[in-house]
UniProtKB/Swiss-Prot annotation:
YGL motif, short sequence motif: residues: 448-450
Chain span(s) of sequence motif DGE motif: 308-310
Organism: Rotavirus A (strain RVA/Human/Indonesia/69M/1980/G8P4[10])
Region of interest (Spike body and stalk (antigen domain)), residue spans: 248-479
Region span, Spike head: 65-224
Protein name (record): Outer capsid protein VP4
Length: 776
């Protein structure tokens, strides 16, 4: 465009701080090789290992080995082993159903010749003959009778070096061990009413689930782990297993310590995290068979949920780190299917979810310690994405799945225009799951991970439930709020100034003379002349330009620019005003995905109006790269901006960067663009209106979407400053020649000035409408 301000912003023709450039490069750099980011990745905090403190949990986790418990009499649960650990020889356990089974187990020390000993069994003294020929191992012997007055018989002896024994109720039988360690095996005794058998233990014992078979057998054969063989382990009463566990409250605010001005508050919160992935799918130029990129993008999600009767408003941002780059090349022909790069997250990737809600816990989250979280896992499965080829069957990327496992939590900060919010960043490590992903009708199959094509699988969101805990240093007076950063107050004050400046700018639209505007739009405005009304020195202007570019780099228009190919960026920085247009190949990427949408309009539920309303920014970028010798919308925008800056009484260095950036995106939102093919003109406006007509007669003809897409790819896009409605009205009322019509179609500034100097009401009204659209 004629005015250079936006092009200078696009090409970063002014120097910026080295730290800003390093930060920018680091944020845009894509790595094919993923490194382990560590537990404090992408945060500004040192790698300090804070202890989690106490985290109340409403979930009971069953221990592998529970005990030791003191000798007692009770009814053990079914499918749980009593692991008996006697210290001395004698009776160690007895149990009966009082009907047809009396079972007792005795322990005999090593090296005992056959002898008769007296044992007290079920309260009665009995004479039992025992022996143990082993000199190193202890001998467990089961004594059994089937009537209350019967005689005991000996069964299933176990020679044990660790001196451990087990008994369990399961499947209608009483189970014990027999044989010789380290190869002991189990043996069962059928017992009626087995589940009601009471056991009396005469030694310390443990309880271990039947499901832990390999662990339990290892204990029987080899002994308890070393930590259990110490006098620091004190047996407790079995009644401790019956303690009622209080369920933790969903919201808990606990005062840890307090002084006159400050207090430490511990916040325990149940949490529901909902998040979703976002992606970018970009087609390459050409015939429509090639895709340049399928990548993940950060995704914001806002939602509400109920926590302990309280409605919580939450906000999450999901991003990925450590993506894996894949590609598919079906051949070198223009009609061969190609995906230059598509991203996949796998076990070497991480998913970050930044979470904030409006509860008390986040109000003063500035000085925080003892941060901990416990979250459930979540399975993310990929859906189908069809690659719409112009001809032939469409390949479909389908499948793929990963599980997300909690891998830590740190503090993070989310910035808005009004306030910076301290939030929690939950980090998830990944593991690949079934099914694998593939691309149908290609050789790509049997790959694992989650591709970026359709990561949400048509789900609105993924959900993770859990709990977090933190201790925060907050003011003792609950009415005070800890200042998060000075930028909060500064930003709020700046927003007030910007609001006043916007009102002034919008009011100044009524005072701009159109002849002055056209003349100013023809000038090669640059950064220095744009800021000349504020600072006179070159150094100050450079500083101002640097600040403008810092703002502009984060704007929506700059984001769109960054998605274009390098060749388009080069063309945008080197193009000069002339009658011939180049950068055709580079600019194709700015339109290809839009043309595809328009071509496929018949197969979608969206209307042409809806689809064309989404292409305004790309048409605008195409206009920047393909200039003619006529004026365009950005010439008018820059001229209006310059005029308002000169007339403003409230403009200041602090507010100028925001105003320039905002103007580059919002001035003249309702734009119309045209392409020309000999005597035919096709126009598309950003509000969805399409029209086609012949220049000589201004007769409307059917709008050919395919032709429009082809012309946009191969021809300059012209700003329709004087749109078709205005042209037809001008011709019907005043009559214009063919040459005048073509000059107005090209937005020739000399022709525009001529009509304005003649005080033509139709042209004047059109320009006034454009000026009034230059609003903030």
């Amino acid at each position: 465009m004629r005015s250079l301000i936006y092009r200078q912003l696009l090409t970063n023709s002014y120097t910026v701080d080295l730290s800003d450039e390093i930060e920018s490069i680091g944020s845009k750099n894509t790595q094919n090789v993923t490194i382990n980011p560590g537990p404090f990745a992408q945060t500004g905090y040192a790698p300090v290992n804070w202890g989690p403190g106490e985290v109340n949990d409403s979930t009971t986790v069953e221990p592998t080995l529970d005990g030791p418990y003191q000798p007692t009499s009770f009814n053990p649960p079914v499918n749980y082993w009593m692991l008996l650990a006697p210290l001395n020889a004698g009776v160690i356990v007895e149990g009966t159903n009082n009907t047809n089974r009396w079972l007792a187990t005795i322990l005999v020390e090593p090296g005992v010749a056959s002898t008769t000993r007296t044992y007290t069994l079920f309260g009665i003294q009995e004479q039992i003959t025992v022996e143990n020929s082993s000199n190193t191992k202890w001998k467990f012997i089961d004594l059994m009778k089937t009537t209350s007055s019967g005689t005991y018989t000996q069964h299933s002896p176990l020679l044990s070096e660790p001196k451990l024994y087990g008994i369990m109720k399961h499947g209608g039988q009483l189970w014990t061990y027999n044989g010789e360690t380290p190869n002991a095996i189990t043996n069962g005794y059928p017992t009626t009413n087995y589940d009601s058998v009471n056991m009396t233990s005469f030694c310390n014992f443990y309880i271990i689930p039947r499901s832990q078979e390999s662990v339990r057998t290892g204990y029987i054969n080899n002994g308890l782990p070393p930590i259990q063989n110490t006098r620091n382990i004190v047996p407790v009463s079995i009644s401790s297993r019956s303690i009622i566990h209080q369920r933790a409250q969903a919201n808990e605010d606990i005062i840890v310590s307090k002084t006159s001005l400050w207090k430490e508050m511990k916040y325990n919160r149940d949490i529901t995290i909902r998040f979703k992935f976002a992606n970018a799918i970009i087609k390459s130029g050409g015939l429509g068979y090639k895709w340049s990129e399928i990548s993940f993008k950060p995704a914001n999600y806002q939602y509400t949920y109920t926590r302990d009767g309280e409605e919580v408003n939450a906000h999450t941002t999901c991003s990925v780190n450590g993506v894996n780059d894949f590609s598919f090349n079906g051949g070198s022909l223009p009609t061969d299917f190609v995906i230059s790069r598509y991203e996949v997250i796998k076990e070497n990737s991480y998913v970050y979810v930044d979470y904030w809600d409006d509860s008390q816990a986040f109000r003063n989250m500035v000085y925080v310690r003892s941060l901990a979280a416990d979250l459930n896992d979540v399975l993310c499965t990929g859906g189908d994405y069809s690659f719409a080829l112009p001809v032939g069957q469409w390949p479909v990327m389908t499948g793929g799945a990963v599980s997300l496992h909690s891998a830590g939590v740190t503090l993070s900060t989310q910035f808005t225009d009004f306030v910076s919010l301290n939030s929690l960043r939950f980090r998830f490590r990944l593991s690949v799951e079934e099914p694998h992903f593939s691309i149908t009708r290609t050789r790509v199959t049997g790959l694992y991970g989650l591709p970026a094509a359709n990561p949400n699988n048509n789900n609105e969101y993924y959900e993770v439930a859990g709990r977090f805990s933190l201790i925060s240093l907050v003011p003792s007076n609950d009415d005070y709020q800890t200042p998060i950063a000075n930028s909060v107050t500064v930003r709020q004050d700046l927003e007030r100034q910007l609001g006043e400046l916007r009102e002034e700018f919008n009011a100044l639209s009524q005072e701009i003379a159109m002849s002055q505007l056209i003349d100013l739009a023809l000038l090669p405005l640059d950064m220095f002349s744009m800021f000349s009304g504020i600072k006179s020195t070159i150094d100050a202007a450079k500083s101002m330009a640097t600040n403008v570019m810092k703002k502009f780099k984060k704007s929506g228009l700059a984001t769109s620019v960054s998605t274009l190919t390098d060749s388009l960026s080069d063309a945008a920085s080197s193009i000069s005003r002339g009658s011939s247009i180049r950068s055709i190949g580079s600019s194709a990427s700015a339109w290809t995905d839009v043309s595809t949408q328009l071509i496929d309009v018949s197969s979608t539920v969206n209307t042409i109006s809806t689809q064309t309303s989404t292409i305004s920014r790309r048409l605008r970028l195409k206009e920047i790269a393909t200039q003619t010798e006529g004026m365009n919308f950005d010439d008018i925008s820059a001229a209006v901006l310059k005029t308002k800056i000169d007339r403003s009484t409230q403009i200041a260095p602090a507010t100028l960067p925001d105003i320039v950036t905002e103007a580059s995106e919002k001035f003249i939102p309702n734009r119309a663009y045209r392409v020309m093919d000999n005597n035919e003109v096709l126009e598309a406006s950003t509000d969805g209106r399409l029209c086609a007509y012949r220049v000589e007669t201004f007769e409307e003809i059917p709008f050919d979407v395919q032709k429009f897409a082809d012309l946009v790819t191969d021809s300059p896009v012209i700003s329709a400053i004087i749109d078709f409605k205005t042209l037809k009205n001008l011709n019907d009322n005043y009559g214009i020649s063919r040459e005048q019509a073509f000059n107005l179609l090209r937005s020739d500034p000399r022709m525009l000035r001529e009509f304005i100097n003649q005080d033509n009401p139709i042209i004047r009204n059109r320009i006034e409408q454009l000026i009034l659209q230059c609003r903030l």
